[in-house]
Structures are given as structure tokens and as C-alpha cells.
């Protein structure tokens, strides 16, 4: 019984060490998305040693084609 327990503990320890090492490795930029309803695209943030690349396009509303469309739109 003690032999099986030590094997389980060893496997758990190896898993934890592997998980921590995997989190430390640089796998690329962290991609975050803005909250829903806000204008802008996702923002890619690199580590402080790299360039911060942030780009958000301006908000655009579709143009109304004629005066009839005004009655059917809701303004925020």
C-alpha cells in the first residue's frame, strides 16, 4: 500500500512542477478582449521587454439610407 501511495504522490508532484514550469514559459502575447458593448478590437499585450501593441478601431455606426429608417432605429 505504501508503494502505491508514494507513486501517486510522486506523480502529483511531477504534475505540479510541470504545470508551474509551463506557466513560466513565454508562449506569446496575452490576448484580452474588451467587454461586450464597447468599441474596439482585442488588445495584444506583450511582456515589458517587448513592444506593447494596442490598436482599437474607431466606433462606427451604419449610415441611414433614407428618412424612413430614422423611425425604426433606436439611439443609445
Curated annotation (Swiss-Prot):
Motif residue range(s): SxS motif essential for MIK2 binding? 36-38
For bias kind Polar residues, which ranges apply? 64-76
GO MF terms, alphabetically ordered: LRR domain binding; receptor serine/threonine kinase binding
Functional description taken from the UniProt entry: Brassicaceae-specific phytocytokine (plant endogenous peptide released into the apoplast) perceived by MIK2 in a BAK1/SERK3 and SERK4 coreceptors-dependent manner, that modulates various physiological and antimicrobial processes including growth prevention and reactive oxygen species (ROS) response regulation. Inhibits the fungal growth of Alternaria brassicicola, Sclerotinia sclerotiorum, Fusarium graminearum, yeast (Saccharomyces) and Botrytis cinerea, thus being an antimicrobial peptide (AMP). Promotes resistance to A.brassicicola and B.cinerea.
Q: Is the keyword Transport assigned to this protein?
A: no
Q: Which family does it belong to?
A: Belongs to the serine rich endogenous peptide (SCOOP) phytocytokine family.
The record's region (Disordered) falls at 56-76
Classify the source by domain of life.
Eukaryota
Q: In which tissues is it expressed?
A: Mainly expressed in young developing leaves, hydathodes, immature flowers and elongating pollen tubes.
Induction of the gene: Induced by increased levels of photorespiratory hydrogen peroxide H(2)O(2). Transiently up-regulated by cold stress but down-regulated by heat stress. Induced by the necrotrophic fungus Botrytis cinerea in systemically infected leaves. Accumulates in response to salicylic acid (SA, benzothiadiazole (BTH)) and jasmonic acid (MeJA).
Q: Does the keyword Oxidoreductase apply?
A: no
Record-level GO cellular component terms: apoplast; endoplasmic reticulum; plasma membrane
Q: Which GO terms describe its biological process?
A: defense response to fungus; response to cold; response to fungus; response to heat; response to hydrogen peroxide; response to jasmonic acid; response to salicylic acid
Please describe the quaternary structure of this protein: Interacts with MIK2 (via extracellular leucine-rich repeat domain); this interaction triggers the formation of complex between MIK2 and the BAK1/SERK3 and SERK4 coreceptors, and subsequent BAK1 activation by phosphorylation.
The residues the entry assigns to the signal sequence are 1-22
Question: Which organism is the protein's source?
Answer: Arabidopsis thaliana
Protein name per UniProt: Peptide ARACIN 1
Q: Which residues form the propeptide?
A: 23-35
What keywords appear on the UniProt entry? Answer: Apoplast, Cell membrane, Cleavage on pair of basic residues, Endoplasmic reticulum, Membrane, Plant defense, Secreted, Signal
Amino acid at each position: 500500500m505504501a508503494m502505491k501511495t508514494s507513486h501517486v504522490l510522486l506523480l502529483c508532484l511531477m504534475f505540479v512542477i510541470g504545470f508551474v514550469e509551463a506557466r513560466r514559459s513565454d508562449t506569446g502575447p496575452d490576448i484580452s478582449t474588451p467587454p461586450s458593448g464597447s468599441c474596439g478590437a482585442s488588445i495584444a499585450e506583450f511582456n515589458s521587454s517587448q513592444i506593447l501593441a494596442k490598436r482599437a478601431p474607431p466606433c462606427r455606426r451604419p449610415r441611414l439610407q433614407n428618412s424612413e429608417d430614422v423611425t425604426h432605429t433606436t439611439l443609445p
